[in-house]
Amino acid sequence: MTLTVLNVAYPLAPVGPDAVGGAEQVLSMLDQALVQAGHRSIVIGCQGSSAAGVLIETPAEPGVLDEAAKRRAQRAHCAAIATARARWPIDVVHLHGIDFDAYLPGDGPTLVTLHLPLDWYPADALNPAREDLWLHAVSAAQQRTAPPGARLIGPIPNAVDVDALSEPKAKHDFALVLSRVCPEKGIHLALDAAKKASVPLVIGGKVYPYETHTTYFRDEVEPRLDDRRRFLGPLGFVAKRRLLNTARCLVIPSLAAETSSLVAMEALACGTPVVAFPSGALPDVVEHGKTGYLVGDVDEMAEAIAAAPSLDPETCRAEARRRFSLDRMVSSYMDAYRALARLGTDSGQLATAR
């Protein structure tokens, strides 16, 4: 069964292999997998995106990302979805944005991946009335947080391309943070912990032009930077892979409930242990004392950063290969696409018969 799948990214973040966010990276992996399998992949993303299949770009918002900018971007996405559905026989629409309900098609087989904490979504958006609208979590830990009344199918766990990431290199004496730069990611705490541990820290990530994000960077991150604690800005895949393979550890000081932590999986694929607060799904990703350390505060984080080189890189790689299989994730999505496409075909045949 050859499929035509329309993947729709969050309107305010570019999608592609070099994307910063986990949702955008997962979408990019699915786009590539669809094309490699001989299906038609269509991607809607804002200007600056890239795709293996057909890309429909919507305008990028040039200024502060306020509510007016969000509404403009959502309207552009609505128009792009309508254009795609008019041009191609779409089997499944796959939405990835937290604001998916703002541009949700009124009919047709639709899959929604809930990449972010479930309590960040409007409660009524998690209770679809349509039988051809399926919502799912990206981890069992996230699924367990579903509010009463939420209608979700089983989770489809995130994964990473271990073969593409793993590039064994000598470890260097620095800790690494890879993250969006915003208050809930707690990057200032990683800076404090690295300073306590007397270990250099490298930060790669993007400050999106939301007012709260730029204020956080200015007030909490920038004052803590010096010649041993550096902010590199956004990183492409090649630079990210090099840093992940050579760091003594990845630090995840997230204050939000991580739904799966793609970057933790990437670090383990590179043989790099993870030091993290036990937020959300992180205890399901990091095995304390084996592939990293789960810590309770900045002091424990500093101790774990110092101890990280004692953990075996090959154990980290082996666990990533065993537990975070990209093939398994892609297969699960393909199964969901086919099931939804059959549902759409059956509905169409029923409507024709009537």
Q: What is the predicted function of each stretch?
A:
Residues 1-354:
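Catalytic cores of nucleotide-sugar-dependent glycosyltransferases that transfer UDP/GDP/TDP-activated
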